[in-house]
Amino acid sequence: MLTNLYFVRHAHSTYTPDELGRPLSLKGSRDAEVSNRILENENIDFIISSPYKRAIQTVEGIATFIGKEVAIEDGFKERTLSLEPVKDFNLAITKVWEEPSFSWPGGESNTVAQKRGIKAVEKIVNTHEGKNIVIGTHGNLMVLIMNYFDQKYDFEFWKNLDMPDIYKLTFEYKDLKEVNRIWKRI
């Protein structure tokens, strides 16, 4: 039985130091509407999201469309890069991708964040077998999850994601069978 997980990278957000409560920007809100229109054609059964406001806001339109609440799953929250703000984000993110077990003080390594994401994926695939599930999440974690199944989903792939972006991962039981990008600007 096939289970489809639609990973939705959140749309553009307005920067605030409040990582959890950072909202979508005006552009992000418009792009979220586009992503929701795309998902309306996918026979979605459930919506699950990271607890971060920008991820929830990106998928709440499809939840409204199907008449379901957005369920929160902490396993899909963004990876913690560092406890304190980093001085050079590009340097910091490059380092964790070059050395998967490396972490900045108070942060998660790629290995740790990936394990957290995969645990959440396995839970959903086991609980919602044969269903179509939207997952509102974050680019870095989404690519780490995809990388677990196929190494071609790497740092360069992450750098080229759109915001938002949508990837449909099709599972047969716990085996990933297919990955398709379904995001497109309308």
Range-by-range predicted roles:
Residues 5, 131-140:
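Generic beta-sheet signal
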Residues 49-50, 115, 136-137:
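Short beta-strand scaffold positions
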Residues 3-69, 111:
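Active-site-proximal alpha-helix that buttresses catalytic centers in soluble enzyme cores
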Residues 61, 144-148:
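Active-site signature of alpha/beta-hydrolase-fold catalytic machinery across serine-
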Residues 23, 64-118:
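Phosphate-handling substructures
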Residues 2, 38, 68-72, 78-90, ...:
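Acidic, low-complexity terminal tails and accessory targeting/binding regions
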Residues 41-43, 124-131:
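Glycine-rich phosphate-binding loop signature in dinucleotide/nucleotide-binding domains
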Residues 13, 141-142:
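Short active-site segment of divalent metal-dependent hydrolases/proteases
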